[in-house]
């Protein structure tokens, strides 16, 4: 029964995390249509990519047995985020933006390669799991914490236009699903970061309940832009994971903060 419950929460986490990973698609369709990244930033997608790669590696059977559902969603997330980064490179609005994105992508590849090779060639058993788990956990916590700037903005402006309800709900549900999955599997490297994600998602929902009837100072087009940025969490999210990643606030890419395990 416990294994079945773990499986069901893992599947639930996969479905919700996939939604968070795909949330920036409208932004990238706009980039492709206009053939320019405009003021959007590629930083969130590179950060979500390294998180997905490390989490997917951690979930592999020879690193962490019985965590294949962690690998499936983060493997899918890595493919999606790679596509985002490629689009960013192709349609970068300036040469500087392209070089910056390329440099970050190279750093992501280097860090992942280092962790993977060291864990594969130099470590075994629990030592391998420890290295990969710590690396994935640190990245996941950083991604989950990234929406703090948006939460601060909501409190400052008293406007939830900066924090879409469905995205906040998805972050909470995703974090909670993976938190319970980690508890059932007795895996601290899944439980700890997603416990943080669940808590921060709950805080976002509380803020939404408090300020949902207020337009605040962020009404109008400014609020719309900030709201779009927040959808790009994913990834992240999360988690997962804000829908645009505007340069004015790269930290909104909590995505796969909110979505990663």
Swiss-Prot record:
Domain named MtN3/slv: residues: 7-95, 133-215
Topology Extracellular: residue spans: 1-6, 64-71, 123-129, 186-189
Coiled-coil parts of chain: none
A single MF term (Gene Ontology): protein homodimerization activity
Subcellular localization, as worded in the UniProt entry: Cell membrane
Residue segments, region Disordered: 218-261
Reaction(s) catalysed by this chain's protein: D-glucose(out) = D-glucose(in); D-galactose(in) = D-galactose(out)
Keywords from the UniProt entry: Cell membrane, Membrane, Repeat, Sugar transport, Transmembrane, Transmembrane helix, Transport
Lineage: superkingdom: Eukaryota
InterPro entries: SWEET (IPR047664), SWEET_rpt (IPR004316)
A Gene Ontology term for the protein's cellular component: plasma membrane
Gene3D superfamilies: 1.20.1280.290
Membrane topology (Cytoplasmic): 28-42, 93-101, 151-164, 211-261
Topology term for the membrane: Multi-pass membrane protein
Membrane-spanning parts: 7-27, 43-63, 72-92, 102-122, 130-150, 165-185, 190-210
Key word Transport present: yes
Assembly: Forms homodimers.
Family as reported in the entry's similarity comment: Belongs to the SWEET sugar transporter family.
Known function: Mediates transport of sugars across the plasma membrane. Can transport glucose and galactose, but not fructose, mannose and sucrose.
Stated name of the protein: Bidirectional sugar transporter SWEET1b
């Amino acid at each position: 029964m416990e294994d079945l419950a773990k499986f069901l929460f893992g599947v639930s986490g996969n479905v919700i995390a996939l939604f968070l990973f795909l949330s920036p698609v409208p932004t990238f369709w706009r980039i492709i249509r206009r053939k320019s990244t405009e003021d959007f930033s590629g930083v969130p997608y590179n950060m979500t990519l390294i998180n997905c790669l490390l989490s997917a590696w951690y979930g592999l059977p020879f690193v962490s047995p019985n965590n294949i559902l962690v690998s499936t969603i983060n493997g899918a997330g890595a493919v999606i985020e790679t596509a985002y980064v490629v689009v960013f490179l192709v349609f970068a609005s300036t040469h500087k933006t392209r070089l910056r994105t390329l440099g970050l992508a190279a750093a992501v590849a280097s860090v992942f390669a280092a962790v993977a090779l060291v864990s594969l060639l130099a470590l075994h058993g629990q030592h391998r799991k420890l290295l990969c788990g710590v690396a994935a956990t640190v990245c996941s916590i950083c991604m989950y914490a990234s929406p703090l700037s948006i939460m601060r903005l909501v409190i400052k402006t008293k406007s939830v236009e900066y924090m879409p309800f469905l995205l906040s709900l998805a972050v909470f549900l995703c974090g909670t699903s993976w938190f319970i999955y980690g508890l059932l599997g007795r895996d601290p490297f899944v439980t700890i970061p997603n416990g943080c994600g669940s808590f921060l998602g709950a805080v976002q929902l509380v803020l939404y309940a408090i300020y949902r009837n207020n337009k605040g100072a962020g009404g109008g087009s400014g609020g719309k832009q900030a709201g779009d940025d927040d959808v790009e969490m994913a990834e992240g999210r999360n988690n997962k994971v804000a829908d645009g990643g505007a340069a004015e606030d790269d930290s909104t890419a909590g995505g796969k903060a909110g979505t990663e395990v």
